[in-house]
Each structure stands twice: as structure tokens, then as C-alpha cells.
Amino acid sequence: ENVTGDKAGKLDYSYLGMEGVSFIPIKCEDEYAPIDVKMLENVDALIVEYQDSGSRYDSFTNALFLLFQTIHLQKISLSVYILDRSNPCGRQVEGTVFTFADEWAMGIPGIAHRHGLTLGELANLFYCEIGAKFPLHIISYLVRSATQYMMPWSIPPHEDVPGLFTSQFYCGMR
């Protein structure tokens, strides 16, 4: 499947020169629904590359959590590679943390409103929390502080968060 376009869920990977590589969108219409196992059939490795917004409301982060649960519970033999980037809102942690008994609609239970973690750190947290055994590889994306806020986003983390500066306001930064 080729994915083209320039909005969340509609991406153009032609610049990568990766003919013959399939790209699978993991975000579903219902972002809290389990991932369809059929999507993972005949997949050798999964590369996750997107910029987290720094907020627990990030729908792609929710999809990653559900993806990890699916791989773990279905015992799918799949290596997962996370391209880790800095958190656009920095390391500050604030806001409420709710339990699994609370409603899922506000994001992943156990994660603070502004979590202060990178995508790789979130992935490692999810992996450990569910007791996963599949191969997880976190690849650091080094960013110099001078260019940190000018990083291009290849995939917006949410339809309502089109850019890096939006994420700082979205999480309630003053």
C-alpha cells in the first residue's frame, strides 16, 4: 500500500526512494479500538516514526499502546523499531494522572496530561507495563538544542496539532 498526501494519516514517502516497501497506517477510525491483527500479517518489522505531541491525548501514542498490546497478547513475532525524538514540551510533567478505572477517552491511563517523555521512553514504559517479549529497538534521534524547535514533523501527531508550536499550547504551556 502506498500512502500519499500531506496531512495526518495521508503521507508522502516517495522522497525516501523505498519502492516495494509497504506502509501500514496504525490509526483506526476509533483510536481506542484494538489494532486489527490482519494488518500485521506478513510484516517482518515495524518502524514507528512520528513526533509525539508531549500530551497523553496524542492519538498516535494511544495507537502505539494498543499496537503493543495486540503484538503481545496475540504473540506476534514482530520486531518493532521506534525512532525516538525529543519531547516538544520538554521534560516538565504536570496535570492529572488517572487510573484504569477512569474513562479511556482522555488518553492512556497512568500517563500525566503533560508526560515529559519521548516516544521511545513511552514505548519502553508501555512495553514494560504489559510485560511484552517481542524485540523492541529504540533508535535515538539526536537534535542540537539550537535546532530543536525548528525540526520538521513528518507526521503530525494529531489532526488538531499540525506543528511543533501548536503542541506547546495544546499541552497547556504558558
Q: PLM ranges: what are they?
A:
Residues 32-33, 54-57, 87-93, 145-149:
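Short, well-ordered, mixed-charge alpha-helical segments that flank or form enzyme active sites
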Residues 103-174:
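Conserved anion/nucleotide-ligand pocket segment
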